[in-house]
Amino acid sequence: NIRIVTYRNPTPTVDIIIELIDRRDRPIILIERLNPPYGWALPGGFVDYGESLETAAIREAQEEVGLDVRLIEQFHVYSAPDRDPRQHTISIVFIATATGTPIAQDDAKSLGIYAPWEIPPALCFDHGQIVQDYLQYRHYYRRPGIK
């Protein structure tokens, strides 16, 4: 007799803050989501089975905005159980740099390039908090604390 136990575990995801270093003020890229939940968000997505977090981040950037990114650092982890209305996810957020012209692809309806003071006020998921934490880090070198 083999007993199979099934656990309900959070699903790992990655989000990428992509700074365009060949443009003034190092703006970041946001995508307008093609699928629900609709709205503006950081590029990112689910980690595939057998894939490292870093590989997932690079793949998602290529799939969503068509850019080859250079991962600079792992920024922070966001794990509030209600951060994603679809299911419980844990997001590992990376800061990356890129050059060139991003093009909306995959599940991105469109994309926008935003200077720090131009970020739209309402973003999907907890991405508004992520961007706010990133801007604090970018300007004051303060990492977000544990919540």
Identify what each model region corresponds to:
Residues N1-I17, R23:
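Acidic, metal-coordinating catalytic segment for phosphate/diphosphate chemistry
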Residues P10, Y38, R86-I90:
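Residue-level preference for beta-strand/loop junctions
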Residues L20, Y78-P102, D133-Y134, R138:
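Active-site-adjacent beta-strand/loop module that shapes the phosphate/pyrophosphate-binding cleft
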Residues R24-E64:
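Conserved Nudix-box catalytic region and its N-terminal flanking loop in Nudix hydrolases
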Residues L67-H76:
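A short coil-to-beta-strand element that immediately follows conserved catalytic motifs
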Residues V93-I95, I103-Q136:
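NUDIX/MutT-family hydrolases
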